[in-house]
Amino acid sequence: MNWLTATADGVRLTLHVQPGARRTEVAGLHGDALKIRLAAPPVDGKANACLLAFLARGLGVSRSAVTLKSGDCSRHKVVDIRGITPEAAAGLLPVKE
């Protein structure tokens, strides 16, 4: 899984996001990234906030454990999540490969 790598204190996700979708959901793979559709529009950071909250909820970690590392104004994003193992993260994110 190229989209999921282990870090010292958790995992790093490589994501491709699609803001303005009908609903927020994991949509499968997009190249080497996990594709996530977001219901929030890409305006005033709403899509980023929606993404981080969605990941925190889905992985069962606090919102403060999820950090956007790069891609603030891009569809390609890198997110670090503390307090979860790669195995647990892969099991909690429904990916159709």
UniProtKB/Swiss-Prot annotation:
InterPro entries: DUF167 (IPR003746), YggU-like_sf (IPR036591). SUPFAM superfamilies: YggU-like. Gene3D superfamilies: YggU-like (3.30.1200.10). One of its GO terms (cellular component) is cytoplasm. It comes from the Bacteria. Belongs to the UPF0235 family. This is UPF0235 protein LHK_03181. It comes from Laribacter hongkongensis (strain HLHK9).
